[in-house]
């Protein structure tokens, strides 16, 4: 009997390890753009890690005010939370684990529907590449 999908983003799924973040951005990672976002991902090994670890970055260079940066991060988190099942199912089938970073590329705010569409596209493309 399958359990219903839980659309949550627990703390365990957030990428906080400085070592993994450094590895993600220094080498061995791949990226896919879907303006105004870019996803950077890297398969990882480790038993104690969740299937997906997530990092969201909105640079201060793009938005000086924290209110705007927080809004964009909230939009990305919400979109990821709604559409992460596709990625989780793909990773469970292949037995892989992955570290993901969403990076904001634009200097302007976008509607939540547009951000959600781009996040969904990037998740789908990443799942296809990792499968």
Pin down the residues of each PLM region.
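Positively charged, solvent-exposed patches that mediate nucleic-acid binding
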Residues: 1-131
């Amino acid at each position: 009997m399958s359990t219903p999908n839980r659309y949550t983003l627990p703390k365990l799924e957030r990428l906080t390890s400085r070592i993994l973040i450094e590895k993600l951005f220094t080498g061995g990672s791949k990226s896919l753009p879907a303006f105004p976002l870019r996803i950077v991902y890297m398969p990882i090994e480790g038993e104690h890690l969740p299937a997906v670890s997530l990092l969201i970055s909105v640079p201060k260079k793009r938005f000086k005010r924290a209110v705007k940066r927080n809004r964009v991060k909230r939009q990305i988190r919400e979109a990821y939370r709604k559409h992460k099942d596709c990625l989780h199912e793909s990773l469970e089938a292949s037995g892989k684990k992955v570290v993901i970073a969403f990076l904001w590329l634009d200097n302007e705010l976008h509607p939540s529907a547009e951000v959600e569409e781009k996040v969904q596209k990037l998740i789908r493309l990443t799942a296809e590449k990792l499968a």
